[in-house]
Amino acid sequence: MCIRDRGSAGSSVYAASKAFVSGITRSLVSELSPYNIRINAISPGTITTKFHEQYSSPEKLEATRLKIPMKRLGSAEDCVGPIIFLSSQTMSGYITGQILEVNGGQFIS
């Protein structure tokens, strides 16, 4: 089991929602590919948002930042390029059923 697949106390609903996105992304491929519809998703790591401002302590965010190989938390802007890439028929027309992780290497080790 990979570290990203393990839950943590107090995050069961959040973890379930991420698992849902992953599962439905892969399931819809079988249903929609015959209609030439591609299904992909972005799986962000720790992204600085109001969610983390409200539910994470500065100490926890700093500890997370130090564990990320790139030594920084992600931003919403970090997700823009991957979203454009996966949305483009020209750039990713033969890519479907993929979950693209945008996390600065957060779950490598």
What are these regions (language model features)?
Residues 14, 22, 94:
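Catalytic tyrosine of NAD(P)H-dependent dehydrogenase/reductases that use a Tyr as the general acid/base
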Residues 58-78:
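Catalytic Tyr-x(3-8)-Lys segment
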Residues 75-102, 107:
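C-terminal substrate-recognition "lid" of short-chain dehydrogenase/reductases
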